[in-house]
A protein has these predicted regions:
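Phosphate- and other anionic-substrate recognition elements at nucleic-acid/protein interfaces
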Residues: 1-155
């Protein structure tokens, strides 16, 4: 089994792959785009070609990256940020947040505490379509919003 931790961010993600013995196998940073996802999947496949034998810890339960990982067959475990903070305190009690360390902490968390975490299940086609439709108005509104706020005047 291979364990992957992803420190999620809006522009890029820090990633750490850990073996069953807790040894770091690979660290990297991927872009938050389809090429970044392909890069991550290629890195994982070098160490474990069977997606079902890969557990991924990440601090979000949605988004392009999560959907792609679930669809590819990886076991994706969303970890609450507060829980991730506690896992971080276990590994390094003093110190601030570091993306590389956080990626390793998430990988180690799914390695040691996976039994207490809940993996995401793939969405049905209907659920995916509903989620897409629900996001569409927000996406559309953001795309057409003025660059500066418009002041309303009583008149």
């Amino acid at each position: 089994m291979l364990f992957c931790g992803v420190d999620w961010a809006s522009e890029h993600h820090d990633v750490c792959l850990v073996g069953e013995d807790g040894t770091v196998r690979w660290r990297g940073r991927i872009a938050h785009d389809p090429d970044g996802i392909q890069h991550l999947q290629a890195a994982i496949a070098r160490y474990e070609p069977d997606a079902a034998a890969v557990a991924v810890g990440i601090e979000t339960s949605r988004g392009l990256l999560v959907a792609a990982l679930v669809e590819a067959g990886y076991l994706v475990y969303p970890i609450n940020p507060k829980a991730a903070e506690r896992f971080r305190d276990r590994r390094k009690p003093a110190g601030g947040k570091h993306d590389r360390l956080d990626a390793e902490v998430l990988a180690q968390a799914v390695r040691t505490d996976r039994a207490s975490l809940r993996a995401l299940l793939p969405d049905s086609a209907v659920a995916t379509e509903i989620a897409t439709l629900a996001r569409s108005p927000r996406t559309c509104a953001r795309a057409h919003a003025p660059a500066e706020p418009v002041a309303l005047r009583a008149g």
